């Protein structure tokens, strides 16, 4: 099943450069896989939305939210 997403022109052109002969889905899966490995900043920097410091701050905030959510999850 395919989905339509809206992205900024600059992000689109970065994805086009990254994808080569691969599909957009393949590129995004790769980037998401890197995120799952603990490299959220790689995804943010790749799309040019954050510098490395901002990405690290966001990663820390996400970890804090995750801990908070886990504290509310019933066992």
Swiss-Prot record:
Specify whether Kinase is a keyword of the entry.
Answer: no
- Pfam families documented for this protein: VAPB_antitox
Alphabetic keyword roster: Toxin-antitoxin system
Decide whether keyword NAD is in the record.
no
Functional summary from the UniProt entry: Possibly the antitoxin component of a type II toxin-antitoxin (TA) system.
Name the protein family. Answer: Belongs to the UPF0330 family.
Q: Which HAMAP family match?
A: UPF0330
Name used for this protein in its record: Putative antitoxin PH1062.1
Naturally occurring in which organism (per UniProt):
Pyrococcus horikoshii (strain ATCC 700860 / DSM 12428 / JCM 9974 / NBRC 100139 / OT-3)
